């Protein structure tokens, strides 16, 4: 059966295990936080196979679990440096003493990933390589740190851009079907329609 399971990290980032098709044991993991183990345990306990680990961007709270992950990892290669070098980010996010090192495993270009039921959107702003994933048969979109239910991603970190965020909101987010349910990188879900109506941060970026 189709399902979306949410696992929230101690970093507050959301990891999702998505089983998009009935009568299929193939799942997709959206983002790989440092403590990704519960998501991987869910996959094993339910005898699922991983069709791909799809990263929304390269920040450590969404990618530091790459060493632990099974399955091919896909990312916009504009964020490859961020994903491979988490030590460059930690001081900007947290005072915790996470043990990190450069990731040397394989990273696959997200634009080489092919699935007719999954649309891939490039929405730079939070990072240069930020991506959203729409699972068309489920009526949902995973936005990472692009847009939240009550906010938008910050743009003052490495490769972030305020002007690109504005362009992405107007050209990508406004193109989404208003009935889509948004599953963000942090916080709760909501519909595109509700976010457009009540997210004051996002509304400030919409062209008049």
Where are these regions (language model features)?
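Conserved N-terminal boundary motif of the eukaryotic protein kinase catalytic domain
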Residues: 118-119
């Amino acid at each position: 059966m189709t399902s979306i399971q949410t696992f929230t990290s101690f970093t507050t980032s959301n990891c999702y295990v998505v089983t998009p098709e009935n009568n299929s044991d193939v799942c997709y993991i959206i983002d790989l936080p440092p403590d990704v183990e519960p998501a991987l345990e869910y996959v094993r306990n339910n005898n699922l196979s991983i069709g791909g680990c799809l990263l929304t961007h390269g920040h450590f709270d969404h990618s530091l679990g790459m060493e632990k992950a099974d399955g091919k990892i896909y990312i916009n290669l504009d964020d490859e440096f961020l994903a491979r070098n988490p030590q460059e980010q930690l001081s900007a996010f947290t005072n915790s003493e996470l043990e990190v090192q450069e990731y040397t495993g394989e990273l696959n270009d997200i634009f080489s990933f092919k699935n007719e039921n999954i649309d891939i959107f490039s929405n730079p702003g939070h990072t240069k390589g930020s991506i959203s994933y729409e699972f068309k048969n489920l009526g949902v979109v995973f936005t990472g740190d692009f847009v939240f239910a009550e906010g938008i991603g910050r743009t003052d970190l490495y490769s972030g851009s305020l002007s690109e965020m504005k362009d992405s909101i107007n050209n990508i987010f406004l193109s989404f079907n208003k009935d889509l349910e948004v599953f963000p990188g942090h916080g709760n879900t909501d519909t595109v329609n509700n976010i457009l109506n009540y997210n004051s941060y996002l509304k400030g970026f919409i062209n008049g």
